[in-house]
A protein has these predicted regions:
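Acidic, small/polar-enriched beta strand-loop surface segments
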Residues: 1-11, 154, 158, 165-259, ...
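Assembly/oligomerization scaffold segments
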Residues: 1-99, 187, 192-200
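Extracytoplasmic
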Residues: 21, 32-36, 60, 72, ...
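Solvent-exposed, flexible loop/coil residues
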Residues: 21, 25-30, 34, 104, ...
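Oligomerization/assembly interface segments of phage tail-like spikes and tubes
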Residues: 31-48, 88-97, 215, 263-270, ...
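Short, conserved beta-turn/loop elements at beta-strand boundaries and strand-helix junctions
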Residues: 80-85, 299-307
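Charged- and aromatic-enriched interaction segments used to assemble
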Residues: 83-196, 200-202
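A general structural signal for short secondary-structure boundary/capping elements
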Residues: 110, 123-125, 312-315, 328-331
Length: 354
């Protein structure tokens, strides 16, 4: 692991500070989107080698992590924490996707695609784009008022996903945002008991169960229903509703809201693979828990300390997208509106037509 620091000042060159770093933690989550890194730097004023680096890392500075010469992470320092007079200073960093999570915008899109929306909002925020997966799904109208840039992108892709049937995920590749199809399998790597698994646990929960979805039209009248009869019989009703959208198959969209028993696995291992990150799939063979097959990574934490690379993964049986539902904005005329319009007409007043 190589760690480089760039001071937030025009013309500053990267400085290799690896010799002063005692540990590195790098991780991510499907739900939180931005990947993070925490580096612990020795605070030893009497050490000549460390003193010569003249470390004065501050908020907004850039930290780069490399493994075997390949860029693993590029992020900005958000906060620092010092422990002890001659202990360590820890720096918390976020990749540039954090700008999309913390910035909001107002947009009115018509007859465009999720990929074009992504290019537009990134350009407005000064974020470069890399590989943006094409959906080729035309979105008739999407209005955003104060949504985060990340939510704008994911709401567009969530809407497109209802027609493509695919799942999407945002990631930063250095300074460029990419939108990829979620669930890519880690190649040529297996987590296996007795080889690279040091601990594994397995749990089941029905906390997020949905076993019946009622479909409604724009007049709030029920137009259909999808359900899981077996789960209803066993666990009782956990109901959700879905309102029809133009250009979207209502039955398919409603079925995507059904959710059964969630099974979560936590695995800790050594000699980890750098492709074992949130959003990817990984194979597991573990006799103790009975786990055998392909699972999807929801959260990952990789740690480098004393020359050893360990990783902790939270896995799921299902490949789940970080869906952001878009609520259609429709002008609704109330009974009072209609009566007022009728009164104006009877009085001979001019009535505006929408």
């Amino acid at each position: 692991m190589t760690v480089k620091w760039i001071k937030k000042k025009k013309g500053e060159k990267p400085l290799n500070i690896t010799q002063a770093v005692t540990s590195v933690t790098w991780g991510g989550s499907v739900q939180e989107a931005a990947r993070t890194a925490e580096i612990s730097v020795a605070s030893a004023p009497e050490d000549k080698n460390i003193k010569s680096l003249k470390l004065n890392i501050g908020a907004g500075d850039t930290i780069k992590l490399y493994e075997d010469g390949e860029l693993l992470f590029l992020g900005e320092v958000q906060a620092s924490r010092k422990t002890g007079e001659t202990g360590t200073v820890s720096y918390s960093c976020y990749d540039l996707l954090n700008h999309l999570l913390r910035s909001t915008g107002v947009y009115n899109f018509k007859n465009t695609t999720a990929e074009r929306i992504t290019e537009k909002v990134c350009a407005d925020l000064g974020i470069k784009t890399g590989s943006i997966t094409a959906t080729k799904v035309l979105l008739k109208k999407m209005i955003f008022d104060g949504d985060t840039f990340y939510d704008i992108i994911m709401k567009a892709y969530t809407k497109a996903a209802k027609q493509t049937g695919k799942k999407y995920i945002c990631r930063m590749d250095g300074t460029k945002l990419s939108v990829q199809i979620k669930g890519e399998k880690v190649k040529d790597f297996v987590l296996q008991e007795g080889y690279n698994i040091t601990n594994a646990s397995y749990e089941e929960t029905i906390e997020n169960m949905v076993n019946i979805v009622k479909i409604y039209n724009d007049k709030n009248k029920q137009a259909g229903v999808v359900k899981n009869e077996k789960h209803i019989e066993k666990y009782g009703i956990y109901q959700e509703t879905y309102k029809k959208e133009d250009g979207v198959n209502a039955a398919t969209a409603a079925k995507s809201l059904l959710n059964g028993i969630e099974k979560k696995i936590n695995v800790e291992g050594i000699n980890g693979d750098l492709d074992c990150i949130a959003g990817n799939g990984v194979k597991i063979r573990d006799k103790t828990t009975g786990l055998n097959g392909l699972f999807w990574i929801e959260n990952d934490t990789h740690t480098w300390e004393n020359g050893i690379h360990t990783m902790s993964l939270e896995l799921s049986f299902k490949n789940i997208m970080d869906s952001k539902e878009y609520e259609e904005e429709k002008t609704k005329k109330t009974k009072k509106d209609k009566e007022d319009k009728k009164d104006k007409k009877n009085k001979g007043e001019k009535v505006a037509h929408n």
